[in-house]
Amino acid sequence: MPKLVVRSFAISLDGFSAAPGQSLEAPFGKDGLKLMNWVFATRFFNTMFGKPGGVEGIDNDFMARSDDNIGASIMGRHMFGPPPDAKDKEAWKGWWGENPPYHHPVFVLSHQKKASFDMEGGTSFTFVTDGIESALKQAFAAAKGKDVRLAGGPATVRQYLKAGLIDELHLVQVPLLMGQGERIFEDVGGVESLYECVEFTPSKAVSHLRIVKKAR
């Protein structure tokens, strides 16, 4: 049965997954990009963007598997953008250029209606204004039997967690204290009764945690 999954989602030691102050120069907020240094170091990331080099090993293996059996994605409007300092917000088509790295349908949660559009490489963006369950239903239909990836950001992951709709999370704990920002595990009382950590895999840079919905 297809699942809703979170994969390679970075979280700091004090629980933050995004920093305040998002802008064109700082998509993850001020100093938030430090959460992603482990990704930038992998061979998988460098190969994806046509660059040589990158390290192999545990982190690279997790990144290489992060798109396995994914047929569609869901993200929040803050992850899609635009940031507050974008000049032409109506023309905004995401952070990723003309050929985004998704290569499948992406459903963006939004409070404002916006026409769907297609990008190079098979990525399409559809904007959903009637809630998280509607987005999930549309994403599962588009995925055609494959899993749906919940890409982020933190507020969106938190909404789906509170609703108990996520089947599996792969969180990456980065040895970094941020002090402020946005957490996924905030105001999610009762989540401990729904989920459990079943796998802990440390690398030299980060720790990988697999959290699944408890069997009933």
Q: Model features per residue range: what roles?
A:
Residues 1-216:
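Enzymes that bind and transform nitrogen-containing heteroaromatic metabolites
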